[in-house]
Regions:
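Short, electropositive alpha-helical surface patch
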Residues: 262-277
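N-terminal secretory signal peptides and thylakoid transit peptides that target proteins
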Residues: 1-20
Length: 277
């Protein structure tokens, strides 16, 4: 197995990249450390969200991180051939589970749907995208083929269309106030940061905040892809999210490890960036 340094991965990272081909094989492995899989092009342990994760396809992993809550990590090859994982969630619900972010490609979303059909009492029946980049919206066409809507803010829909990316369905009456998507999920626009449209998802039952690419993992040593970022406003937006959800027991970033404090790490990286500029 080829291992790349964390710095090399992050220097090459881009959320808007195109996905590599995803294998159709659905033979799930037993939970194991990533290193146990071997082979070229696989991410190292530090780059997936957690350990262990179950590999359900060539570029798709899942792990239960709380009762009725699953982390999914999907990977894509980006410039230089580096493999970069993206985190998302599956929230189990009695009448149909919720997918938070689709992965990079339709094939990856298809694998997540197949897995949910087999492993969850109520398969995925709805989805949300936390911003317009491909690692959040790339699987929309697969979901739509199954008559599953992917909701997003009106700004996310507009930006996806502008950048010729899969376009979600707009959430009605979405504004500055937190917006409930049922009793177990709330979404909130804290302000511009990684992108102008990034939102966070709050899971009150678990007291978990999903920050998406708006927040950086503790293993990140820079801000990653900032092509669409609003760096001057980013720190204030992070503080706004922290103030909105002060009871968060876990905060999940869009890429990398879900351990530690991504809020503090993001603020530190922003301070470092400001010092350098």
């Amino acid at each position: 197995m080829t291992h790349y340094t964390k710095r090399a991965f992050l220097a090459a990272a881009t959320c808007a990249c195109c996905a590599s081909a995803v294998g159709r094989s659905f033979a799930a492995t037993s939970p194991a450390s990533v290193g146990a899989f071997g082979g070229e092009g696989l991410p190292t342990l530090l780059e997936l969200g957690t350990d262990p994760m179950t590999r359900i396809g060539e570029t798709v992993w899942v792990a239960r991180i709380a009762p009725q809550l699953w982390l999914h990590s999907t990977t894509a090859s980006i410039q230089g051939g580096y493999v970069f994982p993206a985190n998302g969630l599956i929230v189990e619900r009695p009448k149909g589970s919720l997918l938070i972010d689709t992965g990079y490609s339709p094939d990856q979303s298809e694998l997540l749907l197949q897995w949910s059909n087999i492993n969850l009492a109520a398969p995925i029946s709805s989805a949300i995208a936390t911003h317009f980049h491909r690692d959040r919206t790339g699987g929309i066409d697969s979901l739509r083929a199954h008559r599953i809507r992917t909701l997003a803010s009106p700004l996310t829909c507009a930006l996806a269309k502008e950048h010729d990316l899969p376009v979600p369905d707009p959430i009605r009456n979405f504004g500055e106030a937190p917006h409930r998507l049922g009793p177990d999920c709330e979404i909130f626009f804290p302000g511009a940061g990684h992108t102008r449209d990034n939102i966070v998802a709050w899971l009150p039952k678990h007291q978990i905040l999903f920050g998406g690419c708006f927040l950086k993992s503790v293993t990140s040593d820079d801000l990653g892809n900032v092509a669409d970022a609003d760096i001057p406003d980013w720190a204030a937006s992070v503080r706004r999210a922290r103030a909105q959800y002060p009871l968060a027991k876990m905060t999940i970033p869009g890429h990398g490890s879900i351990a530690g404090d991504p809020v503090a790490q993001t603020l530190a990286l922003l301070a470092k960036s400001n010092e350098q500029n």
